[in-house]
Amino acid sequence: MKPVRRSGGQAVRGLLAGAVLLTAYPPNRLAAQGFPTTPPKPTRLSPARFPPFQEVTLPNGLQLVIIEHHEQPVVSVTLSFRAGGSYDPAGKEGLSALVAELLTKGTVQRTAEQLAATIEGVGGSLSASSGDDFLTVSADALSDQVDLVFDLLGDVALHATFPASELELARARALSALALELSRPASLAGRFFASEIYGRNPYGRSATRESYTAVTRDDVTAFAAQRLRPGGALLVVAGDVTVPQIQSLVEKAFTGWRGAPPPGPAPPAAPVKRATDILLVHRPGSAQSNIVLGNTTAGPTDPMYYAGRIATQALGGGADARLFLILREQRGWTYGAYASLHRYRGLGYWQATAEVRTEVTDSALSELLRQVGRLRTETIPDSELTAVKGFLVGSFPLTIETPSQIASQVANAKLLGLGDDYLRLYRERLSAVTALQAKAAAARLYRPNGLTVVVVGDAARIAARLRAIAPVRIVDVDGKPLTAADLAPPAPAGPIALDAAQFATRTDSSNVLLQGKAIGYTVSDVRRSGDSLLYVERSSLGTGAFEQRTTVLLDPADGSVRQVDQVTAQQSQRAETHLTYAGGRVKGQSAAPQPDGSVKRYDIDTVLPVGTLDENAVPFVVPALPLGPGRSFTLSCFTPSENSQKTLTFKVGGLESVTVPAGTFQAYRIAVTGSRVPFTMYVSTETPRRVLKTEFVGQPFVVELVK
């Protein structure tokens, strides 16, 4: 976190206020008033007031828990099924998440819009989500709308229709979110870490582009029919309601609901490691390294949990824990380092994480390992133990203040089989943990000779130093094993033979979409102009708020750029770029509007590698590359708006059917990295090839071909 900067006026006023205070109350006078010099001792633990609840298992196997909580006129309902991601079939990871999203997207009686309008019209909410173990439908509203809540809950649980059109929208959103996730090193580290510690166990699997694409509507309906059954499900109702009232509503909403899900197959055991090693995920050019280390632990009811919770909180539970204080405050290596202990219905895990500067990756990892070792071999000092327990015990009441929080806590305890007294005795059990018990828990939970360590970063810069800590395996971001020879930065391949048949005269029109809504357009023309090819692109966004015309002159023989002229108008700003490419140099002037209202200008005279492409020509040149599934191209590109040269990598995936306003086409999916924002291009297979769609990773913008 950066320090808050105060203006000069604010600073002066602050100094004056301090001077006045010291004048009125000099230090000796303040001391004389008897202000304490040490914090007070903690008071005796007062019992948390957790409302009683009533529980019954209905004839259809549905477990119903009702908590009367009359302090606020609201009601919160959760309906949970054993249908989380761990139940996804192999090769169709993400199925449970798609089912959850589609549950509220239409029923026999209501469309998605009608469902949303009905619950939002009374100020409530209705949603569904999928975790690793459970799929949960949640609803919240004012308590005088509880009849409506159960009407909607029963409707989506029993009568969801899973429209095919909604499935495609959900799939598109999931793929966009996945692309963003894969662009983030912290997310990559988490995915690889789960795979390493769980192996073939379902907890170790993650959704992929291929698995999302493989899911059909039949898969969705079959999964829902098999797993969203009342037998073994849990319905928790908390709020300003009565037991008879809820029993009546449940009977009405779920009339005729029968059945139980089939037992799932026994999951494969997680691998048992005999030695610590490092999985290094190569992310070329990364300025930071993301470190995750840890191992699997125990089941949710293991009595060692409370002592392990104390030890893990001391290690890295917050800004006052050891990892944060040492790696950030003392060393200045990171903005934060943390540790956490996780429970699943099956085997849980613990982890420690840090994002550090590349040059201190090995030092930070060594310090992480050292601090883990200290918790295993040293008892926590009394003052630290008191502070840790004080935080965990004192903050617990904040998690059971509202009906929504109460419902969530009760559901979690019931689903994990933690016992009816878990919430009532949680604070007392934490308070009873001794320093020796915390040390014993750490010694058992943190396995020093079997830790999994995942580092995502620039392997070319850090691999050698990490080998001094533990054996290192290197993979790329797709998990493909790499050797030392693979770590050399990709060199531009120079000129690549382009397919001249793709240079046919044509005009393409595309829409620019923001979160699915058109906000502008782009029109591109390709035609002959004397002995050159002329590529002209015109773009307009926000009803004229942004206008740009780019003209690129190219050599028809090899597609090399000869000249670029660009005029950009952004509200009151106007910027022009005029460049010539010849003899391995680019010369001219470039200008680009900036967010602060200024225009950044460059005088350019730069020597470029052979075959360098102007970035404005990428949409024209890429369709003419010798495309094929599995092929990869590395091109040197010059970016006029930044006066910089970059190396872009174009990886061609498999063929996909892509539907855009212009029609449905077979297309190459091309992942482009190396630019400021990674993006994906979909290029038709028919000659002349056309760019059908462009998606920008982590951005809500999409460009789609219209005609």
Residue ranges of model-derived segments:
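N-terminal secretory signal peptides that target proteins for export/translocation
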Residues: 1-9
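Intrinsic disorder
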Residues: 7, 25-27
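Bacterial N-terminal signal peptides
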Residues: 13-25
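Sec/Tat signal peptide C-region and signal peptidase I cleavage site
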Residues: 28-32
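An aromatic/glycine/proline-enriched structural segment found at the starts
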Residues: 33-41, 203, 234-299, 457-491
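Mature N-terminal segment immediately following signal peptide/propeptide cleavage
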Residues: 42, 46-80
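M16 family metallopeptidases and their MPP-like homologs
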Residues: 65-67, 71-101, 110-158, 171-179, ...
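Acidic, serine/threonine-rich low-complexity disordered tracts
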Residues: 492-583, 626-707
